[in-house]
Amino acid sequence: VATAASMNGYPSSIGAVLRDGLKCTVPATPPVLIIGDTDLLSAAPPELTGSGYADLLAKPCSVADWILAREVAGEGFEEEPLRIMDGVVEAVVAAADGIAALNPASVESLMLGLTLSGLSMAAAGTSQPASGAEHLISHFWDMLGHRDSWRLDLHGRQVGVACIMISALRERLLSLEE
């Protein structure tokens, strides 16, 4: 039972954990059913819902990195995960005011988007459709925070900030003359 629309890991077959201060990916068994009661999800702390929103907004950043990995390094790339996510970010952006107001129907669209994001990773057999450089930066902050006893922010909010940073860097790189 999902208690907050805060992340896309509910359907995931992997998990990111800290082991001896190092962020690692470990296999996980995905559930056969995800229950997301909209009244319960809408009653979650707004910070958690906002974290899920920021994490979902970062998906275009992840996809851009996945495409870049295909073009530059010849890494595998699947179209199906993109089809799964087609229109999801746009629908959630359109519901932004309702999500901020914790409107049950709007929070339901966020939860659906996060669930589809997790399913896109399962379809690809990799986290790349939903986790790019923005997640690596967030994981790095987690490791530094663990080492230096920092108070960290919620995962999705860290990812959102890192996505802004990566997007600015990508724009700068694309503007360089050859």
Question: What is each model feature region?
Answer:
Residues T3-A91:
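A glycine/threonine-rich phosphate-anchoring loop and its flanking beta-alpha core
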Residues R83-E178:
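Active-site segments that bind and position negatively charged phosphate/pyrophosphate groups
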